[in-house]
């Protein structure tokens, strides 16, 4: 049968508080001179489609890098890029893709950085297939979706994201 116990016998003693470990800001370890924006395209042929984004970032004096990585042809390299981008100084990723447009979502699944997806027009569907792929990310894998071929808007949006962590401009 059941034994009768006092309250102090039934509940374990409260453990002593654990000392709080010393915390140092992780930002000090990040590469300060790295590119602020990472632009990823799945194929060298897509470079012209992101030219407007590159020009916009150059005009705004925002550093960036362009990488050619395919979610289908080299998924390990995509995972490596996305998981280490923050350590290299990247603060926002722009990922352009057409067709199945898996690239933005795959990158978002491997990083905590904001990811901006740019659907690219390819084939007979006029980019609608890519748009639907980018805009319909599963719960927990957020990707901001621009218009079809909206690379320039992606760069402007990236600049606005970066501005959130910067001091306000001296003049408006």
Cite the ranges covered by each PLM segment.
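SAM-dependent methyltransferases
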Residues: 1-37
């Amino acid at each position: 049968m059941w034994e009768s116990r006092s309250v102090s016998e039934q509940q374990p003693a409260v453990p002593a508080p654990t000392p709080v470990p010393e915390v140092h800001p992780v930002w000090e370890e990040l590469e300060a001179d790295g590119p602020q924006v990472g632009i990823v395209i799945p194929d060298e042929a897509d470079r012209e489609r992101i030219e407007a984004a590159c020009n916009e970032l150059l005009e705004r004096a925002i550093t960036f890098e362009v990488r050619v990585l395919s979610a289908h042809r080299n998924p390990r390299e995509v995972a490596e890029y996305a998981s280490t981008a923050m350590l290299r100084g990247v603060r926002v990723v722009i990922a352009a893709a057409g067709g199945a447009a898996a690239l933005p979502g795959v990158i978002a699944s491997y990083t905590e950085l904001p990811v901006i997806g740019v659907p690219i027009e390819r084939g007979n569907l006029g980019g609608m297939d890519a748009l639907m792929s980018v805009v319909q990310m599963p719960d927990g894998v957020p990707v901001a979706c621009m218009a079809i071929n909206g690379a320039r808007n992606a760069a402007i949006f990236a600049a606005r994201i970066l501005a959130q962590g910067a001091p306000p401009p001296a003049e408006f």
